[in-house]
Amino acid sequence: MNCLVIGGTQFIGRHLVAELIQGGHTVTVLHRKPKHGFGRRVKNILADRNDPRAMKAALAGKSFEVVFDNVYDWQRGTTAAHVEGTVRAINGPLHRYIFMSSVAAYGDGLNHHEGDALAPDDAADLYVRNKATSERALFRLHQRIGLPAVTLRPPFVYGPANPLYREAYFWDRLRAGRPIIVPGDGRRLMQFVYVKDLVTAALRAMTEKAAVGHAFNIANARPVAQSEFVDALAKVCRKPVKFVRTPREYLLRAGGHPMGPRLYFGLYLDMPPITEVTAKAQRVLKFKPTDFSTGLAETYKWYLRHNHAAKQDYSFEDTLLKHAPVLPPATKV
């Protein structure tokens, strides 16, 4: 099929483009850079997806059968209006419009099914609001004009080539023999999905007729506690882990923030838990997640080959460790 990948040069998009090429599809990447690194097999469109006029001009005279809308602008936000503008700029009949949403679209809460209400239009968190309103806009277009929309709702995505300082954050510290700061008792839940599993789900959404007009939760079936997550990372790199359980309020008061620059538990990982149930994806998309330990092992292999970053600055953590009140070990999770 003739596929347009919006945001195909980073994490999820790079894996997706590679699989599309492997599958013999024609691939075009739309992004804001003049080059994409995929070679001649992949066409390039230079445009800012947050600019409806630029999108219309860039896509004029071009048609696609499938659109994978992966990109989110963390600095400016990507709104429902931006997503609608992209849909209206696409020429020709579409076979599928696959939108990368997020578990965050639910706003909060545990064990969500796809039919649960999404966050309201006035949700305080910009990312939450934009994902929820974008999904609503796409499904309105599905009802009104027959847009063959599918939305995917992953939680934390991990895997090789992750540009976010998440898995590598902990491996850097474990390999350096440093203690790991855990906010609170370490029992806050997290849910993950392997990037290659997410890409497989997107590809199946492209071909499965029953997927049209539906949202899908794409995740490992079982959430893990924060301390379990670190234990799994330590097991993969064969390093002992020393937890320092510290009140979350102290970490924030001292200047720590989940989004940085003063991180204390990786980038954007210490968030109120939102979890989801994946039975629908298993049934319709035949979704079978990779075992967490297997996915982490593959990710660690990539980390070892590519971990050539500058020496990390641990001064903020050293200050925290020096002055932080330490909580007693949590009971078995």
Walk through the language-model features, giving the residues of each:
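Conserved Rossmann-fold NAD(P)-dependent oxidoreductase catalytic core, especially the SDR/UDP-sugar
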Residues: 84-132, 137-145, 150
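Mid/C-terminal beta-alpha module of Rossmann-like enzyme folds, strongest
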Residues: 204-265, 298-300, 314-333
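Conserved SDR Rossmann-fold cofactor-binding beta-strand/turn motif
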Residues: 153-154
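Substrate-positioning beta->alpha
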Residues: 164-170, 183-206, 213-214, 294
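Glycine-rich Rossmann NAD(P)(H)-binding loop
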Residues: 6-7, 159, 183-188, 216-223, ...
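NAD(P)H-binding glycine-rich loop region in Rossmannoid oxidoreductase-like domains
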Residues: 36-39, 43-92, 99, 105-106, ...
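N-terminal Rossmann NAD(P)H-binding glycine-rich loop of SDR-like oxidoreductase domains
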Residues: 3-25
